[in-house]
């Protein structure tokens, strides 16, 4: 007994192991020492990624010769692909490689893509010399050069996308959720992770954004490559101290087993109160049994023990056929995923709003007054106000708002806003951001310059600083939506699907970018005629960008109504270990 108590005090209790596969020693592994390495790594990787992404729309117009709508669509598709690759990274991590190996491999791919882009830009794409600035576009490129460019940027997408969901979950793995102190740190980690992400992009949006706007594209891309390489080295330095979780069997196999087993037993009545449900012991240390719930009753058939199951067990020796009989925990894992999907779908439209910051906000800013005396402000650098807003609201929420809401909360849980409530607030603020952007565009058009009919540069006397409110509102909405989303999916996902849960957040951004691209194409097709330039033409002074912003505000408002219904319907996951705690089956939204 004393030995067990001693092991409980010395080792982590969540099933994490060290790099040799032994139970992780609490004092020698994980916690903030390794988490800080991961946070700095995230900051450097984000600096590198946004060193490319923040001005990619301008690179496509000035160097690759694309118009505004085409460039905005291509940026949306590229950003969407980045986050689609997050699903691949999550699958490999949860099923085969583990989070550490997955992070290392995809970061190496990320560095390789950045180096390829840096080399190809300096040696091949900037022709003639000195091109790539606003008044001096580059000449058309050959098919080979264009293919090389897209190969490099999509290799960057593969590396960064596959790495992102795993580094977030790997950072959370450094804290033992079964320990009260480390459990609190684990929750706080996601806020600091998102803060590191934004602070990392601050340098890209200001310094690198300025040099790239001046045509120094190779310098900006090489700085990004160097930052990514430094981040990879820093990540590897922490190898001896990291805590790991052993990869589970493929979550998709477990998912399919439940569906197949339930289908095979389709004729069984699941509404009978005395069901003989099968539940096995957990396979991995630290795993928790998930308690049976009444939703999605048709899936319970997969856990009903039938005479045929017993007969097959006798024939095979000692085990049930996993494609005929699944444990209650395995069935509940599928239910967890199905319950998450409606919430996840409601976050996609928010990502449509969010992606405008990297595309149409930049195009809009470039068509405003960007000079302060002799200094020219790059339109992309305005996203610095988004980053400052994120930093401010993360600090304000953790230090002031969360404790305030906790005191006002009269329920037994005595906690602040739930993750679902915070995500709803994020949607409301996003609506305000689109309305603000539309109002700014109305005023920009009222102050357009006469000569803008032949030039889209500085085509309005309205200062670019009028964009500050829309950037600040987007930043505030991110703190409530994306941080809440990370915490929500990570806490509600089964043990073997933690990386997949983080990938859901990335996939939401991905689909948001694709939907944004589709929406722009549809709007342009409908609004463009022989004598009308459409809402988002190359010369914004001949369009109606404000209508597109107001359209997004209306769609997001409708999405918010649907979200309220889905959030009210959602039932929180309950595990065996937490059943004795005062956790209600439903939480108020």
Swiss-Prot record:
Organism of provenance: Arabidopsis thaliana
Inactivation phenotype: No visible phenotype. Higher nitrate concentration in xylem sap and increased cadmium sensitivity. A greater proportion of nitrate accumulates in shoots under cadmium stress.
InterPro entries referenced in this protein's UniProt entry, alphabetically: MFS_trans_sf, POT_fam
GO molecular function: nitrate transmembrane transporter activity; symporter activity
Record's protein name: Protein NRT1/ PTR FAMILY 7.2
Record-listed Phosphothreonine modification sites: 102
Family of the protein in this entry: Belongs to the major facilitator superfamily. Proton-dependent oligopeptide transporter (POT/PTR) (TC 2.A.17) family.
Transport is among the record's keywords: yes
Gene for this chain: NPF7.2
Tissue: Expressed in xylem parenchyma cells within the vasculature. Expressed in siliques and flowers. Higher expression in shoots than in roots.
Keywords assigned: Cell membrane, Membrane, Nitrate assimilation, Phosphoprotein, Symport, Transmembrane, Transmembrane helix, Transport
Membrane topology according to the record: Multi-pass membrane protein
Localization in the cell: Cell membrane
């Amino acid at each position: 007994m004393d030995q067990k108590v001693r092991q409980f005090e010395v080792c982590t209790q969540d099933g994490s192991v060290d790099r040799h596969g032994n139970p992780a020693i609490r004092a020698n592994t994980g916690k903030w020492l390794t988490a800080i390495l991961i946070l700095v790594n995230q900051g450097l990787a984000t600096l590198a990624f946004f060193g490319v992404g923040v001005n990619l729309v301008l690179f496509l117009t000035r160097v690759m010769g694309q118009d505004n709508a085409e460039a905005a669509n291509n940026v949306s598709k590229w950003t969407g692909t980045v986050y689609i690759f997050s699903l691949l990274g999550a699958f490999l991590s949860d099923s085969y490689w583990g989070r550490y190996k997955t992070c290392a491999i995809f970061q190496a791919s990320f560095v390789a893509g950045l180096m390829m882009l840096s080399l190809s830009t300096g040696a091949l794409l900037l022709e003639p010399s000195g091109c790539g600035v606003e008044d001096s576009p580059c000449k058309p490129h050959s098919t080979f050069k264009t293919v090389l460019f897209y190969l490099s940027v999509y290799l960057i997408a593969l590396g960064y996308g596959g790495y992102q969901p795993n580094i977030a979950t790997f950072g959370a793995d450094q804290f033992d959720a079964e320990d009260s102190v480390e459990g609190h740190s684990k929750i706080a980690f996601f806020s600091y992770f998102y803060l590191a992400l934004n602070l990392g992009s601050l340098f890209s949006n200001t310094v690198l954004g300025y040099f790239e706007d001046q045509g120094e594209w190779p310098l900006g891309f090489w700085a990004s490559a160097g930052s990514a390489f430094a981040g990879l080295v820093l990540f590897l330095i922490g190898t001896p101290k990291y805590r790991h979780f052993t990869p589970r069997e493929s979550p998709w196999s477990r998912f399919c087993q439940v569906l197949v087993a339930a289908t095979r037993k389709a004729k069984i009545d699941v509404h009978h109160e005395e069901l003989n449900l099968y539940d096995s012991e957990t396979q991995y240390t630290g795993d928790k049994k998930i308690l049976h719930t009444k939703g999605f009753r048709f899936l319970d058939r997969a856990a009903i023990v039938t005479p045929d199951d017993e007969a097959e067990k006798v024939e095979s020796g000692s085990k049930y056929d996993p494609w005929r009989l699944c444990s209650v925990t395995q069935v509940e894992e599928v239910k967890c995923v199905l319950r998450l999907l409606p919430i996840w779908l409601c976050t996609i439209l928010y990502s449509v709003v969010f992606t405008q910051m990297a595309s149409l906000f930049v195009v809009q800013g470039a068509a405003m007054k960007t000079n302060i005396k002799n200094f020219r402000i790059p339109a992309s650098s305005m996203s610095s106000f988004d980053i400052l807003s994120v930093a401010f609201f993360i600090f304000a929420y953790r230090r002031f708002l969360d404790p305030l809401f906790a005191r006002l909360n009269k329920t037994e849980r005595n906690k602040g806003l739930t993750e679902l409530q915070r995500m709803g607030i994020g949607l409301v603020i996003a609506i305000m951001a689109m309305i603000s952007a539309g109002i700014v565009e109305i005023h920009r058009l009222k102050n357009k310059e006469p000569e803008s009919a032949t030039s889209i540069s500085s085509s309005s006397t309205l200062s670019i600083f009028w964009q500050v409110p829309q950037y600040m509102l987007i930043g505030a909405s991110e703190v409530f939506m994306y941080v809440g989303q990370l915490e929500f999916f990570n806490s509600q996902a089964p043990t073997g699907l933690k990386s997949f849960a983080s990938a859901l957040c990335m996939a939401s951004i991905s689909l948001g970018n694709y939907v944004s691209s589709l929406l722009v194409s549809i709007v342009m097709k409908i609004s463009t005629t022989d004598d009308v330039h459409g809402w988002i033409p190359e010369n914004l002074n001949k369009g109606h960008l404000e209508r597109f912003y107001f359209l997004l505000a209306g769609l997001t408002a409708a999405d918010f109504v649907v979200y309220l219904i889905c959030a009210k319907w959602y039932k929180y996951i309950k595990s065996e270990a937490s059943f004795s705690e005062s956790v209600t089956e439903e939480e108020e939204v």
